[in-house]
């Protein structure tokens, strides 16, 4: 539960927060459990102010029941299925990238993961008319390549719109990544920037680059940070009906990186690899985790100047 601090709600000033901490009130739970009359005597904070703060905190942090019919209608109204650039992959995913879900693409270096992300940007903006937040942790994003994919598929007048619909954020460690996700959350709540009114896809390319360094040395701290990151990603997807696409690597023995703990994060997991006995630009994609489609199903795609696409 959140700690009591200045500006946690509008009536908690620095002086109020200090008095509450002196009285042993450290969290919101501590506060709402206290008798307000006793707390007023102990802290010299006016009783009516304490009651008002309690009401504000309960409104901010409590869970309220929702009618099932209303919840269903809200879910239907906010749900989206975003198309990937590969038709066969859309069939494999039962339509595409679902909002409120995390889809992971894992593969070895140079298997085409970033190419797939860039191609998804073009397909989502051009087909679904939605905006994208692209969080780049390893310097793999290329505006020139994105423009090249867009130019090969669309008329020149659409190029500027494609580029303006993708907001790129650099994150060089796990703390910057969590900060970037928090910024997305804040902008979705505030609704001050028109760009975020149309955001439906968040891409993280890649999680491995920022999690692995934190797992070295003090492994328990690193594991805790990984769990914290996973919760932020899943909450962002669920709370704002966003589709989240994350990129992961594979280990030397072909297993997906980050172990069993991370395996519970994605709702869908795809494994991309170089296809045997095929052209160098052909990739095999296997569905290794899904709640909607048959696990083990696979398709072939190719990487061309147009990005990732169905084999012709």
Q: What would you call each of these model-derived segments?
A:
Residues 83-86, 99, 115, 143, ...:
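Amphipathic alpha-helical transducer elements in NTP-driven molecular machines
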Residues 128-219:
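Conserved inter-motif catalytic segment of the P-loop NTP-binding fold
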Residues 3-57:
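Helix-hairpin-helix
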């Amino acid at each position: 539960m959140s700690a009591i601090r200045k500006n946690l709600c509008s009536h908690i000033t620095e002086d109020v927060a200090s008095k509450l901490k002196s009285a042993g009130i450290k969290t919101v739970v501590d506060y709402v459990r206290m008798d307000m009359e006793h707390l007023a005597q102990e802290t010299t904070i006016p009783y009516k102010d304490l009651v008002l703060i309690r009401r504000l905190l309960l409104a901010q942090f409590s869970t309220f029941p929702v009618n099932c019919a209303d919840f269903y209608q809200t879910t239907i109204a906010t749900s989206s299925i975003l198309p990937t650039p590969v038709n066969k992959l859309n069939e494999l995913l039962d339509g595409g990238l679902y909002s409120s879900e995390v889809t992971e693409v894992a593969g070895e270096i140079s298997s085409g993961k970033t190419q797939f992300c860039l191609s998804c940007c073009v397909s989502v903006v051009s087909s679904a008319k939605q905006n994208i937040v692209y969080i780049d942790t390893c310097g793999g994003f290329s505006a020139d390549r994105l423009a090249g994919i867009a130019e090969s598929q669309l008329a020149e007048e659409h190029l500027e719109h494609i580029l303006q619909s993708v907001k790129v954020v650099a994150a060089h460690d796990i703390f910057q990544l969590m900060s970037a996700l928090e910024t997305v959350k804040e902008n979705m709540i505030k609704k001050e920037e028109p760009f975020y009114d149309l955001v439906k896809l968040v891409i993280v390319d890649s999680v491995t680059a920022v999690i692995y360094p934190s797992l070295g040395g003090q492994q328990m701290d690193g594991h805790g940070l990984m769990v914290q990151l996973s919760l932020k990603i899943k909450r962002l997807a669920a709370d704002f009906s966003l589709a989240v696409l994350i990129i992961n690597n594979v280990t030397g023995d072909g297993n997906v990186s980050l172990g069993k703990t991370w395996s519970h994060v994605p709702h869908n997991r795809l494994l991309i690899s170089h296809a045997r006995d095929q052209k160098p630009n052909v990739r095999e994609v296997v569905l290794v985790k899904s709640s909607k489609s048959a696990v083990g199903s696979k398709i072939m795609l190719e990487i061309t100047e147009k990005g990732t696409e169905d084999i012709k």
